[in-house]
């Protein structure tokens, strides 16, 4: 992603946090690739003013931190009302009402870190990515080119990290559901009888 500088600098402890910009996934992807926390906000939560516009209808600021505690601390500072709208397409346009950051944010982001904060939330994890879908990648001629539609063999060290993450989510009150992933199956034809985007 285009925010790799922010991601790698934060991961290497060159700074306590980084500020990336995202249009598609260029804020989240560097965080995922460097083991960081990232937050992609809704429109108006973090001011975009002053950033280089790539696609003004999609651009958002994405902070990077090494821990969730750091992220919550940072959000308490950077999620603030910005009275100046020049340079911020969404807050400047008159047709879609964008609430002020103060109307959306909690009194304290740090207060969100309690043990039951995910109670009632459900996370869906595609079985094909955690070696739990025996049909994934078994089509006679899978995919639409390149490695698409082929079996994903996730290595044991990543599965161990997944199991730790799953335990943490459940401990925080979340429900974790292992599920199929029709978007990939029906696009890439990854199993016998599955269509592809070309069919």
Can you annotate each of these PLM segments?
Residues 23-49:
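Glycine/threonine-rich beta-strand-loop-alpha-helix active-site module
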Residues 10-11, 30, 40, 114-119, ...:
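Extracellular/periplasmic catalytic domains that process cell-envelope and extracellular macromolecules
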Residues 187-199:
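Charged, often glycine-rich, active-site loop that binds/positions anionic groups
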Residues 175-182:
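General small-molecule cofactor/ligand-binding pocket signal
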Residues 24-28, 60-61, 130-134, 184-188:
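Flexible loop/turn segments at secondary-structure boundaries
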Residues 1-29, 64-68, 72-75:
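Active-site-proximal alpha-helical scaffold in enzymes
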Residues 157-172:
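A short alpha-helix/helix-coil micro-patch that ends at or immediately precedes a cysteine
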Residues 40-160:
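A short helix-breaking turn/cap at a secondary-structure junction
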